[in-house]
Amino acid sequence: MEQEEIVRSLAALAHPVRLEVFRALVATGQDGMTPRTMAEGLAIPANTLSFHLKELAHSGLVTQERSSRNLIYRAAYEHMNALLGYLTENCCRGAECSVAKAAASCRC
């Protein structure tokens, strides 16, 4: 990952609403969620959610796909894992540590 991409992704996650939305999408898995489902489940107004989803998509952390009349949003696991890899690549000076074990447990 390029440093500019990393900074954009971290900046997107630095907002409490975007972090909450992203974590909900990660937990949902590849099925993703519609904005309506997210707005109801997270108690976020639709217009607020729309703004934050746009920011997450711009950062590369979230993808969107049209399915019939609905937009489906999903966490971009490859991007997320690349970001985690960048943040932890020099962790513990290369020795096995709990961070590496946690990253390996993600089966996305």
Each PLM stretch: what is its role?
Residues 1-5, 26-27, 77-108:
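Amphipathic alpha-helical dimerization/coiled-coil segments
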Residues 4-48, 67-79:
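N-terminal helix-turn-helix DNA-binding core of bacterial DNA-binding proteins
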Residues 8, 58-59:
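A generic local structural motif
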Residues 40, 57-58:
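Alpha-helical residues within the helix-turn-helix
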Residues 53-54:
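Short, hydrophobic-biased segments on the C-terminal half of alpha helices
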Residues 65-67, 97:
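Conserved catalytic-core motifs of GNAT/GCN5-like acyltransferases
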